[in-house]
Amino acid sequence: LEKELGIKLFKRAGRGLELTEAGRILYQRGLALQNSYHEMAEVMTELSSGAGGIVRVGVSGSATQFLLPEICKTLQLQVPNVKLEIQIGMNDVLFTLMERHVIDIIIGPLVNYESPVVQVPVTADRVVVAASRDHPLAGRPVSLRDMSRYGWILPAKTVSMRQWLDKMFYENHCPLPDVKVEISSLASVPGLIAKSGLLSFLSENILVEEEFISRLIRIDNDQLMMPRRVGITWREGAFLSPATQKVIEVTQNVGKKMQSEARRMLED
């Protein structure tokens, strides 16, 4: 191969060999070609099986509560041959998985990434402080200093909404939240809040879910209300199989339906 290309691909390193700069570039390009081949093979399999296929989806904890159930229901009705492989986690973890080609798309909050990505908004959301309905702070206006006296369930400091929350306490000269439980996924947090007596910071959409509306309440403080967009993220230039495109289309339609229902509720 070196003779054919006319360039050194390996160099001596002690008793072994290591790649030269040209060798590293060739290796990276080879991996990209290999991934393209596998992607094309998957597409051919999907087409031969009637628009079926596997879509690897990363989903944020909040989206598993208010978006994912409706997405799965619609997919089963429209394209029952599509299979979802779901990873639930925080944005930072999911993005690492996407960069490694472990997942194809992310459904969750749209945040800034260092690597180039495509992002499609699906719906709007607000992150608010929540607690059980019998929490001492429930049902009355409270200050940041009041909340700093109680324990919290929060994600790691690498997660954007945790950084936003800490910044709000810091800028208002209040002690940072006293984190009693640090959690890797917010999917199980609503149940924990209801039983543990701890505060948390989570999607307002979850608080109106039938399962939690009688158990959880938003703590009355307008300073700690973080607006955000929720949508779909994938790597710029990534190949999207027909099955993946269908999941994206269904997710967008579910988001539109949710927004029109929310508007109707406000009008009523």
Residues of each region from the PLM?
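A short LG(V/I)-centered, amphipathic sequence patch enriched
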Residues: 2-19
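A late-sequence structural motif
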Residues: 67, 188, 217-261
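Central regulatory/effector-binding core of bacterial HTH transcription factors
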Residues: 52-115, 175, 182-183
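Secondary-structure junction motif
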Residues: 137, 151-172, 240-249, 255-266
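Alpha-helical linker/hinge and terminal dimerization helices associated
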Residues: 4-5, 26-48, 258-261
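Hydrophobic residues within well-ordered alpha-helices
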Residues: 20-23, 57, 97-99, 147, ...
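Short beta-strand-centered segments that line the small-molecule binding cleft or hinge
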Residues: 28, 32-35, 47, 70-74, ...
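Hydrophobic hinge/microswitch elements
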Residues: 90-103, 109, 161-218
